Amino acid sequence: MDYSKTLALPKTEFPMRGNLPSREPQMQAVWEEQNIYQQVLDRTKDRPSFVLHDGPPYANGDIHIGHALNKILKDFIVRYKSMAGFYAPYIPGWDTHGLPIEQAIINAQGLDRRSIEVNDFRQRCEEYAWSYIDKQRDQFKRLGVRGDWENPYVTLLPEYEANQIRVFGEMAKKGYIYKGLRCVYWSPSSETALADAEIEYKDKRSPSIYVSFQVADGKGKLDIETGVVIWTTTPWTLPANLAISLHPELEYNVVKVDGRKFLVANGLIEAASKEIGWEGVEILATFKGQELEGVETQHPFYDRKSPLILGEHVTLDAGTGCVHTAPGHGEDDFNVGQKYNLGVLCPVDHEGKMTNEAPGFEGLFYEDANKVITEKLKENGALLKLSFFTHSYPHDWRTKKPVIYRATEQWFASIDGFRTQMLEAIKNVKWIPHWGETRLANMIADRGDWCISRQRVWGVPIPIFYCKACNEPIINDTTINHVADLFRKEGSKVWFSREANELVPEGLSCTKCDCNDFRKETDIMDVWFDSGSSHQAVLRERGIAWPADMYLEGSDQYRGWFNSSLSTGVAVYGTAPYKSVLSHGFALDGEGRKMSKSLGNVIVPQQVIDKMGADILRLWVASVDYQADVRISDAILNQIAEVYRKIRNTFRFLLGNLDGFNPATDRVAYEELGELDRYVLAKAAKVAKRTRKAYDEYQFHTVFHAVHNFCVIDLSAFYLDICKDRLYVEAPDSLKRRAAQTVMYDCLLSLVKLVAPLLPHTADEVWAFIPGVEEKSVQLTDMPEGDEQHLSFAAEAESKWDAFLAIRDEVLKAMEEARRNKVFGNSVDAKLALYPQTEEVAKTLAAMDDLADLFIVAHVDVHSGSAPAEAVQLEGIAAVVSAADGGKCERCRVVKPDVGTRESHASLCVRCADVVEQHYAHVTE
């Protein structure tokens, strides 16, 4: 007789294989059709809000793995918060102005920026930006990131630009905006000034030269045979030399070498001698730096003097202690030059070419001038040593080319005006990780004024007019409001399409000379001012929340968006625009190396999704400790895919065994559940509580491990394995079977909600198969908190069950050895004789019911005496594993002594015979 039809085997249409690359887009189409994002907002609209404000990616190129890491982390938080009692809108944004798009247009279309009409060029830039917004939007949505994708914020939109103008206006009104001649980072490759945040450091090979400036007037201290020795790595700045700086308190020695006299700082004689190749150095005289102030030296190739001046910036870190000072090419040089009224000489133009203020070197690119200048020094006998070395040097973060210091007139935001307020505001922000506070505070404490002007056209113009008669800059509430209103109506392009007199408010006249003829500023704002104004242009403009609950970006944004947003927030409103800041590390390859095409180690998110699915990539993000740099490779992703498979299989097993289960009518009351069932519910409640805490602390790798371990260890390898007999063999409506189904149902509901923020596609796929749920999506439910009744049971019974599981693990070792020795085939063919070696083990076993079920064997005997010689000695217990007595039941496959005692079903045990006769008579007739 075929008894297989009398078994309640798992049955579900939930597929074993995820087929995520094809199934996820279908799921996303359903979400879009149902407008699930709006449904979530409508459901939670009366709850307290949690606003994670999106830092805008740049609208250029495809998204990379760093983008994926960032957006997925944000999505984890937003999805969790919306299931945890909060109204959590998410408005994605894009940063759209700036040099990279200008450069992309110039390169792609072969344009000469200077020969094309400005608004035509800007229109091409805008079209380019929108094309990549559309592309990146699709790529972010494919990651499963939920948000208001149809209404993002974009820095080129008129309403955004208008808000940015108002932020600028407020800062100007408070006196924080000024125009000044300063030494700033200048990028010849971009032809514009740059801010600190636009600088990155890379290794560069540079010349290292020691040069002698001959004393022309020693002021009674130094004779004219003495050479003052300077050291520089930028020979091209020597045409701009106007002085030599000494530290007032340092000691300087006149030394004699090979018949020549030189001045060098006492603390650097040894190092300089080694570098230059001096031997037999004789000290002739010693002076304090302040004694030599006013001594004049002769410039090594121009007919002018370079005086010795005093500066606190001089150190003994390198060189000679006599510092070549070119106020046009260094911040310290500029500052000390102002003190001594040296003037500013900057003989390098916007392209990095030497001007006619550097006679003999006109037209040379500054780096090419190095060689010619060095040869000139050698010819004049001023070059003491030339060598080359590699050092860390500032580069333009966009073009990757070196930058220089160049004195130019620029617009600045005076950080000194609100530095103290910023440092105070930082203390009121929650920093994750905690070291973020110190990192940003140090940057704020040390930073100079913010250069906010750029000599480009694709950006938001600086809204300032100048009187044509007296050159007075005009900026006030009237002009700012007028320009902001114009931009809101027509966009910033209006600034470039109209003359200044068409842009000014009606009736405007110069406050200084009463003239009413104006010109307009031609510079645009730093793009960090664009994105740094987003708290105003998005959060306040849309009435969402201010300050935001969280900013979340890569750790490079301490000098970027975190910094610029803090600057504008504090300057305008006196406080930080965020309550908390979370930063993550960078994505590296499997060996911890930076990804690069040359190494062939680049992981492309789109390729991962096409091959494995977005939920695999998301699970990888959940698995890593993102606060440090994270690793990703094909091998790592394959490991993650295996974890996913185990989680999915757990879901499938639970669903399969809930076939025919109606939670409304088939649930077993908690009081009627067995102790094992209550123990597993207690474990599930603890997992829910631990997971909620981990989500609240943004510890997603803790969520990952908690869920994975619960699926694999507590369920698959323990409870579900033990329950198979109950589920398949017991009567369909029996208390034991329904009890197991009740536990499985509750575990399934809890698990699918706990993973929903991490694996939204899979969670909603599972949700569609769960019996008795009313909501269309798991996204429209709340997170489990951990049932208090279950948690209180955990407190009572956990130590007992943990002790038993430790014993069980030991006994399973003996069973595995017996299986290898062919004592039995399946565990239900075996019986156990257990010999506790301690009182604790004996008590634990005595307190357990149904030991045979718990060990998944035919029979268990616990003995109090000594273990026989053949027993396997284990930790705290000895065990004898042997073949069970009796016959193998054809239906339940367990070896039992009562098999064959029922004539009508001679191949069954009594239990199975009863079940068949009472519930499956129609099947076996």
Curated annotation (Swiss-Prot):
The compartments listed are: Cytoplasm
Primary localization = cytoplasm
Tell me the residue numbers annotated for binding Zn(2+). 889, 892, 909, 912
Q: Which InterPro entries match?
A: aa-tRNA-synth_I_CS (IPR001412), aa-tRNA-synth_Ia (IPR002300), Anticodon_Ile_BEm (IPR033708), Ile-tRNA-ligase (IPR002301), Ile-tRNA-ligase_type1 (IPR023585), Ile-tRNA_ligase (IPR050081), M/V/L/I-tRNA-synth_anticd-bd (IPR013155), Rossmann-like_a/b/a_fold (IPR014729)
**Cofactor requirement:** Zn(2+)
Does the keyword section mention Nucleotide-binding? Answer: yes
- The enzyme's E.C. designation: 6.1.1.5
Q: How is the cofactor bound?
A: Binds 1 zinc ion per subunit.
Oligomeric and partner information: Monomer.
Q: Which family does it belong to?
A: Belongs to the class-I aminoacyl-tRNA synthetase family. IleS type 1 subfamily.
Name of the featured protein = Isoleucine--tRNA ligase
What organism is listed for this UniProt entry? Brevibacillus brevis (strain 47 / JCM 6285 / NBRC 100599)
Which gene produces this protein? ileS
